[in-house]
A protein has these predicted regions:
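Thiamine diphosphate
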Residues: 1-126
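Flexible, glycine/proline-enriched loop segments at strand-loop-helix junctions
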Residues: 133-139
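Small/polar-residue-rich loop-to-helix segments that shape phosphate-bearing ligand pockets
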Residues: 111, 130-133
Length: 139
């Protein structure tokens, strides 16, 4: 097998998640973050991690599952983007008020009507005051 020179951002996040080996990952696919749970689920199915992967019916449920897992003492992660984050807003404020250290990978995308997949920070700015402690933006 040849040397791989680079990873996409989503592959890099999934690889970092593999190294973390969280207890629970709950995610619902939304463009452009879909590849994160997709790549990570291959690590789960191949036995590279012993994470409980929860495929949920919505982003609201993804954050709810992370809140439940983290409240029980598990390390929980999720990934989302744009309108998916908007659907999580209610639960993000609950997670923040409970001071739960949930890791969420947010792949920035414009929040708007159908088919806007261009990059901006309107999704992150919508929840910036939720007191999720750290935000790292990378080009």
């Amino acid at each position: 097998m040849g040397i791989r020179e680079r990873l996409s951002g989503n592959e890099a996040v999934a690889t970092a998640m593999k190294q973390i080996n969280p207890d629970v990952v709950a995610a619902f696919p939304i463009t452009p973050s879909t590849e994160i749970p997709q790549y990570f689920s291959t690590f789960v199915s191949n036995g590279a991690v012993d994470t409980e992967f929860v495929a949920v019916e919505s982003e609201h449920s993804a954050m709810s599952a992370c809140i439940g897992a983290q409240s029980a003492g598990a390390r929980a992660m999720t990934a989302t983007s744009a309108n998916g984050l908007s659907l999580m807003w209610e639960m993000i404020y609950i997670a923040s008020s409970l001071r739960l250290p949930i890791v969420m990978s947010l792949v920035n995308r414009a929040v708007s009507g159908p088919l806007n997949i261009h990059n901006d920070h309107s999704d992150a700015m919508g929840v910036r005051d939720a007191r999720m402690d750290y935000a790292i933006f990378r080009k």
